[in-house]
Amino acid sequence: MAGPQESSTSSGSRKSGSRAVGQFNIGSEIGKGSFAQVYLGWHKETKAAVAIKSVELERLNKKLRENLYSEIQILKTLRHPHIVALHDCIESTSHINLIMEYCELGDLSLFIKKREKLATHPATHDMARKYPSMPNSGLHEVVIRHFLKQLTSALEFLRSKNYVHRDVKPQNLLLLPSQPFRDQRSRPVMQASQDSLIPISGLASLPMLKLADFGFARVLPSTSLADTLCGSPLYMAPEILRYERYDAKADLWSVGTVLYEMSTGRPPFRARNHVELLRKIEAAEDVIKFPREVSITPELKALIRSLLKRSPVERLSFENFFTHQVVTSEIPGLVEDDIPKSLRQESRDPRSAFQSGSPSLSSRSPRQTGHQSPTEALVSRSPRDQQPRSPQVGSPGGSRYARRSNESQRTTGNSPREGGEGLGIRRPVAQHAMTAPVQQVAYDSVTGRNRASPPTSLLDQVRRNRALSNPPITEEERAAQDVALEREYVVVERRHVEVNALADELAANEKLGDASQRSGPITRRYTQQGAPTSTTGAISTPYSRNALATQPRHDRKSSYEKSLSASPGSASSAISKAIQDASLRLFGFKVPPLRASPKGPSPPLYQAFPTYPTPQAPVGLLGDGRNVQGTDEDGKAAQTIEELATRSDCVYGFAEVKYKQLVPLAPSADHILGGLEPEQLVNEEDGLTVEAIVALSEEALVLYVKSLTLLARAMDIASLWWSKKSRGDTGTGLSAAAAQTVVQRINAVVQWVRQRFNEVLEKSEIVRLKLTEAQKQLPDDHPSHPSNHGTESIASSAGSPTKQVYLTPGISAEKLMYDRALEMSRAAAIDEVTNENLSGCEISYITAIRMLEAVLDNDEGSGSETRRLSTGKEAEREAVKEVSGGELDSDEEAHVRKRRLAAVRKKQQMIAEANSKTNLVYQQAVRRRSGDMTPRSVPSHASS
């Protein structure tokens, strides 16, 4: 049992391998997430390898703890060779340690990504030699069908127990080396039961697949529907993205995306967020295209297309999927070594030996009831068929496969679940029993093995979907709904929703040139007047596994002029209902629901404004009290938004300098399949000390927060402009062409702001995680150590599961920006005096001016007090004033910079004029010389 002193150790001590949890020693870290770390461990006596998932309880809110306990309860009841088993669960005062099966080949996403390097790994060398991957394609079809059979076996088992996984994706499909390779290895792997590491489908010579991560799984009978938004966006079913009621068929969509990625090497739909993802799915209209380089059979393509249907009614049913020809038939193209040499009697099929009261798998599929043809049974038969076994009493924890009692015992260690005490969460002190949010299935109440309901008919499903198109849900149920987006149980943050909602609305209505084009008045409900919440770096955001590369900047022109992917034709507001439910949960009020048009566009568009909370009128839009024409108001709005976007881009570029020092490259994933052991991994941050990482993280974080603040102000102004435009308050004397130009101009900036906002939000979360981890590694007496934190912090947003971020006193974005502007101005002044690199001087002066304007920028116009750091703006202004020596304030500094910029531009103009005169004189001289050499025509004397 882990004591309190073990739980309070830092992550650095965890990596040392000196800790122990129960009967297991903790080794090196093999995985990491926002709330948990995964370590390689060994049993103290048997030396069998395990995976230890250590979850820090302080980082979890109530809902996340319920998800964790739900995962534990589900894993306690599941025993299947193709589902990752839970060996033990040990809870201390600050951590929950899940002892799970160790899958040393990593997950399927890494397997697909490194498919060209599989020949270099000992565990996959033979497979890559027999079934190589084609260039510009995915895995070999034999490997695809092998994994499909094993995944189908796991899903069929879950289906028999009325479970829906809800997060099937390559990252949750873990791989073990093949059984022959494991038998040759000296390092054993702990097995949950005597046959948990023996596959029951597929080929014995290929890696073994196991389904993992049941944090989003729940009991869902075949007649029930769920409405929780959870899972991973790239693999979410469209009905989940639309926030509609869904059933277990959502897992079949995810299976289709996994099959497509295995076949092509990439997901079928790629997007930055779930709104764009749903837009692409709807635009495809169920037309799934495969690259020409992909060489798979038409049967496999047809199966993938039948799974990737937008409508659950049209999607392949579970019964048809389990009995599909691709799943049950012989795998084509096998090498001679992988073809079974003999066929066993159907009565000896071990898959009919389930020892639980739940519906057996043998009664659910014709391929398991003895009606298989010899060709179908050739490959679908389990590798266990060569090991006949007798029935054995299973444990109460779940179903067990029977095995011959006199079979030799394997050398690997056995799970604690094999003992008579069963699996429970061991606590250091006596506490009340925990309550899992997922109701446990009463297996004893199941009468007979044929209890499983047949699949609902097409007519019944259509009738049910119509009845539930607008189901009555109480306010309490809405408030309790999850809004989770990645595998780390991420809650959608309020400002994140607002920014994307407004950008989608503008993109969808870009052609709205005049308010008169709108048909009918806009029905508005009451919404709270106020500013959005703070957008800080302490926000839980989806962690991206991809490299966050940024393009170098050679100029200080408006970077939002780049090409944007805003398509008015295909733009749609996919999560309108999700926005309403999230607003009720996160904001405290509800935005108006959407009214579906008679044609029923899917998804419906947002209404004109109330989706985005009304901000107070910003300073940039206030005039002198006189009536201003619509053209002037639109122009001022566009100019103000562009200025804020440009200032935020300057601050973002400064933050990127810090970020690239912290994250020079994306996390390398070459080690697991590159032939290296986890113990051989080196720390990629050895080039920076812990103090340097803390300093860089703090500076990058406050700069990212400042950039987010400017971007949020730009969206506030765009929101106010759009609300007036939608109500028809402006544009009375504006031509249609001019109005369209202004709308397109502002829409382009808004789309750029949305893209940059999401990017900065993601990077700020990465920096925040690095900062908190680095602070834990500091000495205990260091001022920045968590035990010595003061009150200066960036407060986390309401409802965020993350802790506060503590900053060193005196760190502020304004001070950093002022120092940077001063440094750039001095360097530019030296070049100006020497008349060197005047173009660089201009860029430096422009950047310095915009940074100073960002320093002067305040949040008074937006009405958002929470957008300020807890240290206060006044203290930061005083710090800037102290740096300048009290001689000039920030306004005077900006004025001086503008004067210097004007002087530089004047010099550049003079140099350009002098160069043009020199070129003109040179061209005239060349023309005269060439004229002397040109033959002249002889005058004609014919007339004389």
Curated annotation (Swiss-Prot):
Keywords from the UniProt entry: ATP-binding, Autophagy, Cytoplasm, Kinase, Membrane, Nucleotide-binding, Protein transport, Serine/threonine-protein kinase, Transferase, Transport
Binding site for ATP: I30, G31, K32, G33, S34, F35, A36, Q37, V38, K53
Basic and acidic residues biased stretches: 865-881
GO terms of molecular function: ATP binding; protein serine kinase activity; protein serine/threonine kinase activity
Enzyme Commission code(s) on record: 2.7.11.1
Stretch list, region Required for Cvt trafficking: 924-930
Cystine crosslinks: none
Motif window: LIR: 428-431
Protein name: Serine/threonine-protein kinase ATG1
Highest classification ranks of the organism: Eukaryota, Fungi, Dikarya, Ascomycota, Pezizomycotina
Name of the coding gene: ATG1
